[in-house]
C-alpha cells in the first residue's frame, strides 16, 4: 500500500505540482547503508556543499569522483565504474578530463541529509577555463595530489587559482597504496610550497576506496554552505552549456537566489530574450527530471534556446515578472593563446563543417571563431585555442562526434603591433596599436614602430639531475629564468619568462624527452613584451605566396628560412620550368633552393656528328625555356600547401 501511494504521488507531480519531488537513494554512513526517501528541495542551505576536485593531470580526480558517487549510492558499485563523469570519447581514450561535469550526491552524516554538488574539473593547463568556470559555482575544493609523483606544475597553478577565489581547500593525498608512494615527503612538499598544515592532509587510495569515506566527512565539516538567499527574487548563473539536437542549448546553472519552476518565463540579462522553462533536472550523474530548482542548488535548465549564440557562459537568468534584476558577477573568460586555420578537406563539406564547429563552440566557449579564406585551401576559419592540447582535443572531437576531417594549419600566436605614420593609423580607424594573428596580414615594416609578442610565466618541476639539459632547452627557446626553489633533495621548481611562440609547437615534448617523462610544465599569461620580430615571405620564381608567410624572431630567421625552403624543395613536384624557392626578410633573400626542371633530350633524334644541327636545337630549347619562365604559371598542388602548413 505504501509503494502504491508513492507511485500515485509521483504520477500526480507533473499535473498538480504540489507534492515534493522524492528521490529514492541508497545512502551511506561509515557503519551501514540504508534506503531513504528525500525531498531534495527541502534540504536547508546549511546542509548543501558545492565543491570541485582540482589536481594535476592523472592524479586521480575522475577515480575519486567515481568512489564518491559509489559511497553516496548515486551509482551502483561496479568494476566497470571508470571515469563515470568523463563522457566524451576523447576523455576515455586520453585518460584526461576535458569537459567539466556535474553530479549531485545525497549523503547522510550524523543523522542529517546533505546535498553535495560535485563539479568535476579538467586538470590540464589548456582547460583552465573549464576549471575557472567550475569554481564560479563552488565554495570549496579538494586539492588532490599523487602521493607518488608529488606536487606538479599544475598543482601549483590550481592551488593559486582556488586561493585567488578565496575557496576553502581540503588537501588530499591519493595513491597511497602504490609501492613507491611517499606520503610523508609529499605532505612536507605541501607545507614547503603552500604552508598547508600537515595534520590537515587526508591520505586515501581512490582506486582501492581506502579513506574515501573520510573525504565526504571532511567536505561536510570543513566546507562552508553556499551564500544564497531563498527568499529573494530568482537569479541563476550559467556556468556551462552544451547542445542537444532535439532540445537546443541546455544550460548548467547555479541558483544564487530564489527558485525557478517548469513553465515559468525567464529572461537573459545578456540578450534580453524571454524563454519558457521547458525542463529542469538534477545530474546524478544522468539527468533526473525535477519540477523546481532552489537557491544553493546546481541543475540543468532547458528553455528552448535554438541557437548556440543565445547561451552565454557567465550570463544571469531571472524571472520575467521581476523587473530590473542586477546581474550576478560572472567570471573572466580566458583569451585564446594559440591560433590555427581550419579548412574542410573538400569545399563541398564547408556547410557541414561550419555547423559542427558552431555546435562544438557552444560546448567549449573558450574557442574563438573568425571566418578566413585562402587561395590554396579555400574557405575556412581561424580558430583560437587555449593551448595545443585544447587544439588537439577540439580536432579529435570534430572527427569523432561529427565525422568531419578538417585540415588544421600549424598553430601561431597573436602579436601586438604599434603603428607609426598618420596615414597608417588612419587606415586602422585611428588606432595606433593593432593585434594580428595571421602573418599574411602584417603591415609594412616601414609603418611599424615596435612589435610585441605574448610571453608566459612558465613553471617547471623536474628531477634535479635534469636541471642542466632543461636550462639549455629554455635558453634555446629565448627563456629567462626568474626563480628556482628546491622542493626536496631530488626535485627543483624553476620559473621562466618565455615567448609563447617558442612553446606552442614542441616544447612540452622536448621537455618530457630530456627528463625521461618526469618533468611537468605549466604556464600562465604574462602579457606582451617588446621583441625584434620579422615577417618572412616565400617567393616562387619571384611571386609572393601569402599562405607560406611566417613571423619569426630575428635571431632565428636564418635557420627557419633554411628549413622552410628545403621542405618546399622536397614537396613541390618538378615542372617544365626551373623554380627558384626563396625566403626573404625585408626584401632581402636569406635562403634559396632551386628546383630543377624536367630535362627533354632534344638531341636524341640526331645521328652522326652534325655539331651545327646539335647546337641549333640546344639554342632553340634554351630560348623556349627562357620564354616559358616568363609566362608559365607554377603549379603548386594543394597537397603541398597542406603538408607545409599542417601540424
UniProtKB/Swiss-Prot annotation:
Enzyme Commission no: 3.6.5.-
Catalytic activity: GTP + H2O = GDP + phosphate + H(+)
GO molecular function: GTP binding; GTPase activity; mitochondrial ribosome binding
GO terms, biological process: positive regulation of translation; translation
Cited InterPro entries: EF-4, EFG_III/V, EFG_V-like, G_TR_CS, LepA_C_sf, LepA_CTD, LepA_IV, P-loop_NTPase
Subcellular location: Mitochondrion inner membrane
Domain tr-type G: from-to ranges: 46-227
Keywords of the record: GTP-binding, Hydrolase, Membrane, Mitochondrion, Mitochondrion inner membrane, Nucleotide-binding, Protein biosynthesis, Transit peptide
CDD domains assigned to the protein according to its UniProt record, in alphabetical order: EF4_II, EF4_III, LepA, lepA_C
Alphabetical list of Gene3D superfamilies matching this protein: 3.30.70.240, Elongation factor 4, C-terminal domain (3.30.70.2570), Elongation Factor G (Translational Gtpase), domain 3 (3.30.70.870), P-loop containing nucleotide triphosphate hydrolases (3.40.50.300), Translation factors (2.40.30.10)
Membrane association type: Peripheral membrane protein
Keyword Zinc-finger: no
Chain positions recorded as GTP binding sites: 55-62, 120-124, 174-177
Transit peptide range per the UniProt entry: 1-34
Family affiliation: Belongs to the TRAFAC class translation factor GTPase superfamily. Classic translation factor GTPase family. LepA subfamily.
NCBIfam families (UniProt xref): lepA, small_GTP
Purpose: Promotes mitochondrial protein synthesis. May act as a fidelity factor of the translation reaction, by catalyzing a one-codon backward translocation of tRNAs on improperly translocated ribosomes. Binds to mitochondrial ribosomes in a GTP-dependent manner.
Name of protein: Translation factor GUF1 homolog, mitochondrial
Lineage, uppermost ranks: Eukaryota, Metazoa, Ecdysozoa, Arthropoda, Hexapoda
Amino acid at each position: 500500500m505504501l509503494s502504491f501511494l508513492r507511485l500515485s504521488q509521483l504520477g500526480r507531480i507533473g499535473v498538480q505540482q504540489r507534492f515534493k519531488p522524492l528521490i529514492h537513494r541508497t545512502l551511506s554512513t561509515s557503519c551501514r547503508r540504508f534506503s531513504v526517501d528525500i525531498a531534495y528541495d527541502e534540504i536547508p542551505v546549511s546542509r548543501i556543499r558545492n565543491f570541485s576536485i582540482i589536481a594535476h593531470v592523472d592524479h586521480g580526480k575522475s577515480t575519486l569522483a567515481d568512489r564518491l558517487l559509489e559511497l553516496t549510492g548515486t551509482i551502483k558499485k561496479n568494476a566497470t565504474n571508470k571515469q563515470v563523469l568523463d563522457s566524451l570519447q576523447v576523455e576515455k581514450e586520453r585518460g584526461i578530463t576535458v569537459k567539466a561535469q556535474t553530479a549531485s550526491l545525497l549523503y547522510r552524516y550524523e543523522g542529517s541529509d546533505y546535498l553535495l554538488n560535485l563539479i568535476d574539473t579538467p586538470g590540464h593547463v589548456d582547460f583552465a577555463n573549464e576549471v575557472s568556470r567550475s569554481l564560479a559555482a563552488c565554495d570549496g575544493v579538494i586539492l588532490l595530489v599523487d602521493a607518488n609523483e608529488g606536487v606538479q606544475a599544475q598543482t601549483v597553478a590550481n592551488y593559486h587559482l582556488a586561493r585567488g577565489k578565496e575557496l576553502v581547500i581540503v588537501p588530499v593525498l591519493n595513491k597511497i597504496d602504490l609501492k613507491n608512494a611517499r606520503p610523508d615527503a609529499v605532505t612536507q612538499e605541501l607545507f614547503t610550497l603552500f604552508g598547508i598544515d600537515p595534520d590537515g592532509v587526508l591520505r586515501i587510495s581512490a582506486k582501492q576506496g581506502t579513506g574515501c569515506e573520510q573525504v565526504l566527512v571532511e567536505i561536510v565539516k570543513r566546507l562552508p554552505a553556499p551564500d544564497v538567499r531563498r527568499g529573494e527574487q530568482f537569479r541563476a548563473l550559467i556556468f556551462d552549456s552544451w547542445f542537444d539536437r532535439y532540445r537546443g542549448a541546455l544550460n548548467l546553472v547555479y541558483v544564487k537566489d530564489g527558485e525557478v519552476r517548469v513553465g515559468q518565463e525567464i529572461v537573459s540579462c545578456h540578450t534580453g530574450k524571454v524563454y519558457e522553462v521547458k525542463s529542469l533536472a538534477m545530474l546524478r550523474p544522468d539527468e533526473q527530471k525535477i519540477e523546481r530548482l532552489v537557491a544553493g542548488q546546481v541543475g540543468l535548465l532547458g528553455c528552448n534556446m535554438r541557437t548556440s549564440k543565445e547561451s552565454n557562459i557567465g550570463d544571469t537568468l531571472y524571472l520575467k515578472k521581476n523587473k530590473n534584476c542586477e546581474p550576478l558577477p560572472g567570471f573572466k573568460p580566458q583569451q585564446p593563446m594559440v591560433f590555427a586555420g581550419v579548412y574542410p578537406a573538400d569545399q563541398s563539406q564547408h556547410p557541414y563543417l561550419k555547423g559542427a564547429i558552431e555546435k562544438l563552440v557552444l560546448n567549449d566557449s573558450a574557442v574563438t571563431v573568425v571566418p578566413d579564406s585562402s587561395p590554396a585551401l579555400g574557405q575556412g576559419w581561424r580558430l583560437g585555442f587555449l593551448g595545443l592540447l585544447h587544439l588537439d582535443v577540439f580536432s579529435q572531437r570534430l572527427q569523432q562526434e561529427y565525422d568531419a576531417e578538417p585540415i588544421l594549419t600549424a598553430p601561431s600566436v597573436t602579436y601586438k603591433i604599434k603603428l607609426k605614420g598618420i596615414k597608417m593609423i588612419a587606415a586602422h580607424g585611428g588606432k595606433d596599436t593593432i593585434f594580428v594573428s595571421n602573418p599574411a596580414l602584417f603591415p609594412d615594416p616601414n609603418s611599424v614602430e615596435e612589435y610585441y609578442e605574448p610571453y608566459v610565466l612558465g613553471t617547471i618541476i623536474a628531477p634535479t639531475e635534469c636541471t642542466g639539459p632543461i636550462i639549455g632547452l629554455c635558453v634555446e627557446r629565448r627563456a629567462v629564468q626568474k626563480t628556482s626553489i628546491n622542493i626536496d633533495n631530488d626535485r627543483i621548481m624553476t620559473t621562466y619568462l618565455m615567448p609563447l611562440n617558442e612553446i606552442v609547437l614542441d616544447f612540452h615534448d622536448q621537455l618530457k624527452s630530456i627528463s625521461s617523462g618526469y618533468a611537468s610544465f605549466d604556464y600562465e599569461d604574462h602579457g606582451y613584451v617588446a621583441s625584434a620580430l620579422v615577417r618572412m615571405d616565400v617567393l616562387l620564381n619571384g611571386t609572393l605566396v601569402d599562405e607560406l608567410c611566417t613571423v619569426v624572431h630575428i635571431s632565428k630567421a636564418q635557420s627557419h628560412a633554411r628549413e622552410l625552403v628545403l621542405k618546399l624543395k622536397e614537396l613541390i613536384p618538378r615542372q617544365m620550368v626551373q623554380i627558384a624557392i626563396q625566403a626573404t626578410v625585408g626584401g632581402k633573400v636569406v635562403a634559396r633552393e632551386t628546383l630543377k626542371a624536367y630535362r627533354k633530350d632534344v638531341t636524341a633524334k640526331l645521328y652522326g656528328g652534325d655539331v651545327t644541327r646539335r647546337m641549333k636545337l640546344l639554342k632553340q630549347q634554351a630560348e623556349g625555356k627562357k620564354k616559358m619562365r616568363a609566362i608559365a604559371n607554377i603549379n603548386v598542388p594543394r597537397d603541398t600547401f597542406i603538408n607545409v602548413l599542417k601540424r
